[in-house]
Amino acid sequence: MQKQRFCLDTTAITDSDVRKSLGVSNISESAEKIMDIIAQARVQLDISCHIPYNTVYKELIGFLVREECAPETLIKVNTWLVKKTPNRYEIKIPAEIFYEYIKDLRERINKGMRISENAMYETALEAYILSKPDEKDREDVLNEVLSKTVNSFRDKYRNTLRGGTLDSAPDLDVLLLAKELDAAVVANDEGIEKWAQRLGLRFVNARDFPFIIQEYLDLWDKK
């Protein structure tokens, strides 16, 4: 059997769907459960789980510290997750992938610009309506209209520009390291999943990952 390797994104440990699937209420519990499963799989089956260093590793540790996870959990992370920096100078990515990414990014920028223009028109129209005589003073109009429009604009802009694409160095490092190691990507991120598929990488949804590893372990115990 081919050695199994997995490359973990932060969401493999911290995502809310993972907690629900494990039946736990907080990140500390889910992180400890996942790390125990990973440790058992490493010792019994030589299954290795990798994390890009220091981008994703730093992001994950920061998250766990903010959530006040036990020091023992952090020790398990440092012990059982193999930290490695992707060899960014040697990994070969087809030029077509870069072409698709730039094309996708350009389309998102254009959509974001249209959302910005629409937000300005909506602000001007609502300000005009609310500023009619004997209704509200200028300051109230600005506060009401701008707060409403800015909140709506922020959500639409974020979804358009960031949803379903790679928007950070840690996201890219997960894919690069997985490609270098021929490992399966573990994440709950639409952008990572989309580009993992385009790179021909195996992808495992974060909420399924602990159960996949546990299935390997259960089968081994039956031998």
From Swiss-Prot:
Its EC number is 3.1.26.5
Q: Which reaction does it catalyse?
A: Endonucleolytic cleavage of RNA, removing 5'-extranucleotides from tRNA precursor
Alphabetically sorted, this entry's keywords are: Endonuclease, Hydrolase, Nuclease, tRNA processing
Q: Name one GO molecular function term.
A: ribonuclease P activity
Q: A Pfam family for this UniProt protein?
A: PIN_5
Q: Which GO terms describe its biological process?
A: tRNA 5'-leader removal
Q: What start-end ranges are recorded for coiled-coil regions in this protein?
A: none
Do you know which InterPro entries this protein is assigned to?
RNA_free_RNase_P
Its biological purpose: RNA-free RNase P that catalyzes the removal of the 5'-leader sequence from pre-tRNA to produce the mature 5'-terminus.
Cited HAMAP family:
RNA_free_RNase_P
Which family does this protein fall into?
Belongs to the HARP family.
Protein name, please? RNA-free ribonuclease P
Which organism does this record belong to?
Answer: Methanococcus maripaludis (strain C5 / ATCC BAA-1333)
